[in-house]
């Protein structure tokens, strides 16, 4: 609380202060008796509001329950919204929360329900930096969705341990390389290009050619695109 009060004193009454708060560490699930619980988090959030905080940003988990912080694909959207909603009931300031938000429609439903005031997202924006723009412009179907495959988490951890590399994304090859791979040069001038095969490689080739202003024809012998990606999407809980 002293830190919050010092920030307020140094930055003034108009400066917004947000506090990230764990709603629960879920340690009872791994046999550890002591840890942050929802009841304790509610008391902390109330104290933060009294100290002058403008927003509570609710997360969860700890090192021992890492899957509740960065959830793999088996976790459903909104699975821990109830925790943030309980915290919000005790406050008058806005509450943001993480809870595996993938689809704009689900985000709208969540905000419309009044459970929280803001959705907090991370990996979805790594997968598609234009997530928000596409959602607002009615292009939700064009969003490149996070798979929940944890590859960004794995590569970020490796980079921290070795001092080399950076977080990478299974569906966004430009992540961390934005200054290296800028927008493709528009040198197609309407010339015709044919791509044979509508698997992941063919689709990416067709996309880049189209961005380069080629007149692209994509040919696929099957009645669906995606190649082997279609088969990999069939098991439950796949992105």
Please tell me what each predicted stretch does.
Residues 227-228:
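Radical SAM [4Fe-4S] cluster-binding motif and immediate context
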Residues 1-196, 200-211, 215-216, 224:
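Flavin-dependent oxidoreductase catalytic cores
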Residues 143, 147-148, 231-239:
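N-terminal glycine-rich dinucleotide-binding loop that anchors FAD/FMN and/or NAD(P) in oxidoreductases
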């Amino acid at each position: 609380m002293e830190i919050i009060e010092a920030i307020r004193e140094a930055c003034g009454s108009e400066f917004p202060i947000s506090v990230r708060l764990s709603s629960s560490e879920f340690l009872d699930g791994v046999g550890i008796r002591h840890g942050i619980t929802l009841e304790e988090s509610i008391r902390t959030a109330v104290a933060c509001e009294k100290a002058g905080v403008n927003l509570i940003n609710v997360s969860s988990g700890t090192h021992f329950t890492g899957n509740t912080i960065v959830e793999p694909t088996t976790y459903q959207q909104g699975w821990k919204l109830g925790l943030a909603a309980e915290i919000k009931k005790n406050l008058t300031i806005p509450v943001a929360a993480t809870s595996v938000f993938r689809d704009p429609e689900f985000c709208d439903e969540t905000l419309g329900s009044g459970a929280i005031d803001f959705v907090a997202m991370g990996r979805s924006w790594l997968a598609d930096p234009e997530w928000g723009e596409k959602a607002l412009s009615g292009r939700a179907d064009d969003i490149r969705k996070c798979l929940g495959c944890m590859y960004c988490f794995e590569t970020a951890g490796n980079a921290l341990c070795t001092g080399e590399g950076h977080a990478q994304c299974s569906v966004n090859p430009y992540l961390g390389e934005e200054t290296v791979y800028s927008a493709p040069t528009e040198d197609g001038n309407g010339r015709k290009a044919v791509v044979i095969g509508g698997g992941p490689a063919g689709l990416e080739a067709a996309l880049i050619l189209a961005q380069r202003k080629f007149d692209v024809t994509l040919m696929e012998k099957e009645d669906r695109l995606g190649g082997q990606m279609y088969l990999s999407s069939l098991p439950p809980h796949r992105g």
